[in-house]
UniProtKB/Swiss-Prot annotation:
Subunit and partners: Part of the 50S ribosomal subunit. Forms a bridge to the 30S subunit in the 70S ribosome.
UniProt KW keywords: Ribonucleoprotein, Ribosomal protein, RNA-binding, rRNA-binding
Native source species: Nitrosomonas eutropha (strain DSM 101675 / C91 / Nm57)
GO biological-process terms attached to the record: cytoplasmic translation
Record lineage: Bacteria, Pseudomonadati, Pseudomonadota, Betaproteobacteria, Nitrosomonadales
Classification via InterPro entries: NA-bd_OB-fold (IPR012340), Rib_uL2_dom2 (IPR014722), Ribosomal_uL2 (IPR002171), Ribosomal_uL2_bac/org-type (IPR005880), Ribosomal_uL2_C (IPR022669), Ribosomal_uL2_CS (IPR022671), Ribosomal_uL2_dom3 (IPR014726), Ribosomal_uL2_RNA-bd_dom (IPR022666)
Disordered, as annotated region: 223-264
Record-given protein name: Large ribosomal subunit protein uL2
Domain of life per record: Bacteria
GO-annotated cellular components: large ribosomal subunit
Family per record: Belongs to the universal ribosomal protein uL2 family.
Length: 277
């Protein structure tokens, strides 16, 4: 992946830094694994805003990605690597030996023409998906399941990965990028290696309009609102918030913990908030 800085021919181009990837497929996505994606602009079925700052943007088609990787012991060839507008990672289109095609998250260093395989008997090689019980301790992994057969939920974005730290009984300990160490069942599957497009965070959008193309609307500061709209609102002229930063609903917005899932708290061996020593 190469980063390209645009010449400052206009204010909008001055700060643009985008990736240039010659290996990406230039054509349309595979139609059998593509479906329409309807925008809801952050509204629920009643038309009320449930997620702020969402609306507009370019139309996207959704690519159906195989997160389960349960087609075992059949080698698959990487036909092409594609851009996906719905996520930061790239997609790899696999063609299995029986002719079936599936999209997967493209791992780092995976190339067109290489082969990957799923299953417990697969070699420990970048792009292969195995149950955690068959992965050596210390391996770097991504696309990790939280429940066996449910599909990958952890370490799916560009450049992300985790590390298998230990195995004890029916559970393994996996260290995530946040520093959290979490117990995951050894029958859950994970993919070897880290996710590709690792320089995604080094890109610069460059102008406000490009953010709107992505379907993101402006964020208004609370102190610029009226008291009816935000706890920080109101006052004559330019004023400070007058209290610690909070959300429009009064929840502390800087550093307050919001996790409420007590059911799985015993699966966390080390919190992401603990001091890193």
């Amino acid at each position: 992946m190469t980063l390209k800085k645009s010449k400052p021919t206009s204010p909008g181009q001055r700060a643009v830094v985008r990736s240039v990837n010659s290996f990406l497929y230039k054509g349309n996505s595979y139609s059998a694994l593509t479906e329409k994606k309807k925008k809801n602009s952050g509204r629920n079925n009643s038309g009320k805003i449930t997620v702020r700052h969402i609306g507009g943007g370019h139309k996207h088609h959704y690519r159906i990605v195989d997160f389960c990787r349960n087609k075992d012991d059949i080698p698959a060839k990487v036909e092409r690597i594609e851009y996906d507008p719905n996520r930061s990672a790239y997609l790899a289109l696999l063609c299995y030996a029986d002719g079936e095609r599936k999209y997967i998250i493209a791992a780092k260093d995976i190339e067109v023409g290489s082969y990957v395989v799923n299953g417990s008997g697969s070699p420990v090689k970048t792009g292969n998906a195995l149950p955690i019980r068959n992965i050596p301790v210390g391996s770097v992994i991504h696309c990790i399941e939280l429940k066996p057969g449910k599909g990958a939920q952890l370490a799916r974005s560009a450049g992300s990965s985790a590390q298998l730290m230990a195995r004890e009984g029916d559970y393994s300990q996996i260290r995530l990028r946040s520093g959290e160490i979490r117990k995951i069942h050894i029958n859950c599957r994970a993919t070897i290696g880290e996710v590709g497009n690792s320089e995604h965070n080094l890109q610069s959008i460059g102008k406000a309009g490009a953010v709107r193309w992505r379907g993101i609307r402006p964020t208004v500061r609370g102190v610029a609102m009226n008291p009816v709209d935000h706890p920080h609102g109101g006052g004559e002229g330019k004023t400070a918030a007058g209290r610690h930063p909070v959300s429009p609903w009064g929840t502390p917005s800087k550093g307050s913990r919001t996790r409420r899932n007590k059911r799985t708290v015993n699966m966390i061996v080390r919190s992401r908030y603990s001091k890193k020593g």
